[in-house]
From Swiss-Prot:
Region (Disordered): 1-26
GO cellular component, one term: cytosolic large ribosomal subunit
Gene: rplR
The organism of origin for this protein: Chlorobium limicola (strain DSM 245 / NBRC 103803 / 6330)
Basic residues bias: start-end ranges: 9-21
SUPFAM superfamilies listed in its UniProt record: Translational machinery components (SSF53137)
InterPro entries documented for this protein: Ribosomal_uL18_bac-type (IPR004389), Ribosomal_uL18_bac/euk (IPR005484)
Quaternary structure and partners: Part of the 50S ribosomal subunit; part of the 5S rRNA/L5/L18/L25 subcomplex. Contacts the 5S and 23S rRNAs.
Family: Belongs to the universal ribosomal protein uL18 family.
GO biological process: translation
Lineage: Bacteria, Pseudomonadati, Chlorobiota, Chlorobiia, Chlorobiales
Function: This is one of the proteins that bind and probably mediate the attachment of the 5S RNA into the large ribosomal subunit, where it forms part of the central protuberance.
Keyword line: Ribonucleoprotein, Ribosomal protein, RNA-binding, rRNA-binding
Pfam name, any one: Ribosomal_L18p
GO molecular function: 5S rRNA binding; structural constituent of ribosome
Name listed for the protein in its UniProt record: Large ribosomal subunit protein uL18
Length: 119
């Protein structure tokens, strides 16, 4: 499968799922983006069009993390869950953003669940 086919496939899946996935202030959307070497996660309030918080493997505290990419993703998920609980958010809607629920995306989701987020 060529790179163009992968990108268009992911975009189609993303567009299809975005019709059903919608977050609000009390139950925001947990959006995940996975690049080749990094991972980014955001809690988004779609009603107001605002990002409530974001955590990534590129943030200052996470740059020095060692281990496999999946280990780093799990830690990012834990950090996101802890920040969300500090703001009083316990329930979220998971948006895998067209990526397969496997590997690093699953590790981030598992880390967020370990921290106490429900989805």
């Amino acid at each position: 499968m060529s790179q163009i086919d992968k990108a268009s496939r992911r975009q189609k899946i993303k567009d299809r799922s975005r019709k059903q996935v919608h977050g609000n202030e009390k139950k925001p959307r947990l959006c995940v983006y996975r690049s080749l070497s990094q991972i980014y996660a955001q809690l988004i309030d779609d009603d107001n069009g605002k990002t409530i918080m974001s955590v990534s493997s590129m943030s200052k505290e996470n740059r020095a993390l060692e281990g496999t990419k999946c280990d780093v993703c799990r830690i990012v998920g834990l950090q996101l869950g802890e920040k969300a609980k500090a703001q009083g958010i316990t329930k979220v809607i998971f948006d895998r953003n067209g990526f397969r629920y496997h590997g690093r995306v699953k590790a981030l989701a598992d880390g967020a669940r370990e921290a106490g987020l429900v989805f």
